[in-house]
Amino acid sequence: MVERLSEAARRAALDALPDWSELPDREAITRTLKFKDFGQAFGFMAQVALVAEKHDHHPEWRNVYNTVEVTLTTHDAGGVTARDVDLARAIDAIAAPLSPR
């Protein structure tokens, strides 16, 4: 089982992920991305889904038109783990060329 990050490790990880923030009411991190249109948002989600499936670690997300809200946590560990940080980095890499707002 993967270990939950300590508070110091979580803060350090978030410092390296400036577009992500902690959810105040949960042991999770979140990012909201806005794309130019629904097609671009859905394409982003499809790319993330392939990476998530490969790593067997899946985001919680919500899509409304051009906006995608992503939440990452490791339920088995009861909070944020290295798996969430790794997936957040992958999400940032997928999003970067799409220039989300």
Curated annotation (Swiss-Prot):
What EC designation does it have?
4.2.1.96
Does the record bear Ribonucleoprotein in its keywords? no
**Keywords in UniProt for this one?**
Lyase
Q: Which InterPro entries match?
A: PCD_sf, Pterin_deHydtase
Q: What class of enzyme is it?
A: lyase
Q: Which Pfam family, any one, appears in the UniProt record?
A: Pterin_4a
Q: What is the name attached to this protein's record?
A: Putative pterin-4-alpha-carbinolamine dehydratase
Q: Name one GO biological process term.
A: tetrahydrobiopterin biosynthetic process
Gene Ontology MF terms in the entry: 4-alpha-hydroxytetrahydrobiopterin dehydratase activity
Protein family according to the UniProt entry:
Belongs to the pterin-4-alpha-carbinolamine dehydratase family.
The answer to whether UniProt assigns keyword Flavoprotein to this entry is no
> What's its catalytic activity?
(4aS,6R)-4a-hydroxy-L-erythro-5,6,7,8-tetrahydrobiopterin = (6R)-L-erythro-6,7-dihydrobiopterin + H2O
